[in-house]
Amino acid sequence: MQSSPPNTQHPSPNTIELLAPAKNRECGMAAIDHGADAVYIGASRFGARQSAGNSVEDIGKLCEYAHRYGATVHVTINTIIYNDEFEDTLALVRELVAVGVDAFLLQDMGLMSKVREIVPDTVALHASTQCDTRTWEKAEWLSQQGFDRVVLARELSAEEINGIHSRLPELELEAFVHLSLIHI
C-alpha cells in the first residue's frame, strides 16, 4: 500500500535541501535515517544510474519509507532516449508515479513535454545535470519549458551559482557539493 506523499509544496528560495544519491533501496533508507531530506535513485532503465538495477517495486518501497519520514524520492531518467524506447520510457514513468515517486530528473526535452502531460502536478520535474546548465538564460529557458528545478552543471563555482540565483531567485536550483564522487 502506498503511503501518503509528503508536503509537496516547493521549499522557499532560502531553504537548503540535503539530497543524497542512493545506489539502491537500502542505501536510500540509510541516507534518510542519517538526515537526508531527499534521495535520488535510478530505475533499471533509462537513467544514468540504471546499472544499479533497481526495480519499480524496490523504488516503491523506498518511497513508502521516505514518505513515512517526510523525505522525498527523485528518479533519474536522464539518458538519451531513442525513438524505439520512447513508449517504454513513458510506461516506466507511469509505473513510478503509481508507486509514489516525487520527482523525475530528465534531460530529454521531448520526453519532458510528454512526461508533464501524464504526471500529476504534485510530481516535480527537474532538469538533470546532463542538461549542462551554466547560465541564467538556460536555467530560465528550462523553467519556461516546465521544469520545477534546474540541476546546475557540476563544474560551476559558488560565485557562478550565486549569479544564476540572483537573476532567478524564485527558481529552485540544485548544485552538487561533492561532485559525483560520493556514493552512499
Label each PLM-derived region with a short phrase.
Residues 14-16, 37, 67-73, 101-102, ...:
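Short, well-ordered coil/turn segments that N-cap beta-strands
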Residues 17-38:
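N-terminal basic/disordered segments at the start of proteins
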Residues 18-21, 39-41, 73-77, 104-106, ...:
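Hydrophobic faces of well-ordered beta-strands that scaffold small-molecule active sites
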Residues 31, 108, 142, 175:
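Conserved, mostly hydrophobic/aromatic
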Residues 32-33, 60-70, 97-98, 116-120, ...:
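Acidic (Asp/Glu)-rich catalytic clusters
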Residues 40-58, 77-84:
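Glycine-rich, proline-tolerant flexible connector loops at the mouths of alpha/beta enzymes
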Residues 50-60, 107-119, 155-169:
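Active-site-adjacent beta->alpha loops and helix N-cap segments on the catalytic face
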Residues 182-184:
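Conserved small/polar residues in nucleotide/adenosyl-binding loops
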